Each structure stands twice: as structure tokens, then as C-alpha cells.
């Protein structure tokens, strides 16, 4: 992001320059930018840059907003705040498209999910939109019921254990 900027500027200057909505203070608070408003964008960490990039999108008016992994470099609290802030962009005249691999953020952020699968540099397929829970199930199962097609050989599953010892015993057996 800093390389895309032609000149050096502070977080606040850049937000002011793109301000098209009456939500700057709310976005600054939600993205936790209060302490970095006077800092040069070239001096921000990865997480600070991510929060700044989200804020820059959120202060602008658009018919469609696109976010590529908005939760990258953010801690859990920041991820939920980012998702909450992004959801405020939705109205009858605007849409949000997000690519996200964190299923909890995806669950919170989305109304519908499309899964993408294929072979790099060969082909790619996008599923029809599914409700959130069904879309996450398609992703985890690797099976698309509407197309009667498997997009991955193995399902992804999670094991729940009361203690770490149970997991250690299972791994060693």
C-alpha cells in the first residue's frame, strides 16, 4: 500500500482526502486508528496498514466494495470490528464482496457465500451463492450438493477436546 502512494502523507490526511461519507469518526474508532492518525502511512505495521486500508474504503461512497482477506494481520477483536465496520457499508444501493479464509469472520460478515475451486492456471469454478451456514458446510465438506460434485477429496473437520492431553494421546497413537 505505501508503494502505491505517490507522496508521503499521514493517515488522517489520506482519510480526509477520500472522505465521501459522514462516518469518519465512527470508522476511525472501529478500526482503532486514533493513535496513528498523525503517522506517515509508510511507517505503519502490517496490522495498522490493514486497518487503514479498510478505513479508506469505508469512508468512500461506492456501489460495490471489494475486500481481499480483510482480517489478515488483525487480532480477533480487530477482525470482528473490521467485519462489523464493513457490514455498515451495506444498503439497498451497495454491495460488498469479500474474499476471506477465516470462517468465523466469514460467518459474521456474510449473507451469502460462493466457494471457488479449481486448478491454478488451468480452470476455476465459482459455486452459486448459498446461505452462510450452507456455504461454510460446502467448503468444509468439499462437496457441492446442487451440482452433485466433489471439489476436494477430503472433508475438513475439527476435533474438540477437553484438554490438550487428549490431543497428544491421539497424535502419538
What are these regions (language model features)?
Residues 126-173:
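ABC ATPase nucleotide-binding domains
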Residues 85-98:
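Conserved catalytic loops of ABC-family nucleotide-binding domains
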Residues 1-20, 49-52, 101-136:
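ABC ATPase nucleotide-binding domain signature region
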Residues 54, 82:
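Hydrophobic anchor residue at the start of the ABC signature
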Residues 67-70, 77:
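Walker B catalytic motif
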Residues 1-46:
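ABC-family P-loop ATPase nucleotide-binding domains
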Amino acid at each position: 500500500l505505501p508503494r502505491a502512494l505517490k507522496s508521503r502523507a499521514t493517515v488522517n490526511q489520506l482519510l480526509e482526502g477520500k472522505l465521501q461519507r459522514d462516518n469518519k469518526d465512527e470508522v476511525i474508532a472501529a478500526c482503532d486508528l486514533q493513535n496513528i492518525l498523525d503517522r506517515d502511512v509508510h511507517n505503519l505495521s502490517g496490522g495498522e496498514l490493514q486497518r487503514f486500508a479498510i478505513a479508506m474504503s469505508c469512508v468512500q461512497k461506492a456501489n460495490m466494495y471489494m475486500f481481499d482477506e480483510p482480517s489478515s494481520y488483525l487480532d480477533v477483536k480487530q477482525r470482528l470490528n473490521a467485519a462489523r465496520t464493513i457490514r455498515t457499508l451495506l444498503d439497498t444501493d451497495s454491495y460488498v464482496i469479500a474474499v476471506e479464509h477465516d470462517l468465523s469472520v466469514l460467518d459474521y460478515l456474510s449473507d451469502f457465500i460462493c466457494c471457488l475451486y479449481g486448478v491454478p492456471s488451468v480452470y476455476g469454478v465459482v459455486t452459486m451463492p448459498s446461505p452462510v451456514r450452507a456455504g461454510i458446510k460446502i467448503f468444509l465438506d468439499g462437496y457441492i450438493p446442487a451440482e452433485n460434485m466433489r471439489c476436494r477429496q477430503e472433508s475438513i473437520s475439527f476435533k474438540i477436546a477437553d484438554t490438550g492431553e487428549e490431543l497428544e494421546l491421539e497424535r502419538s497413537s
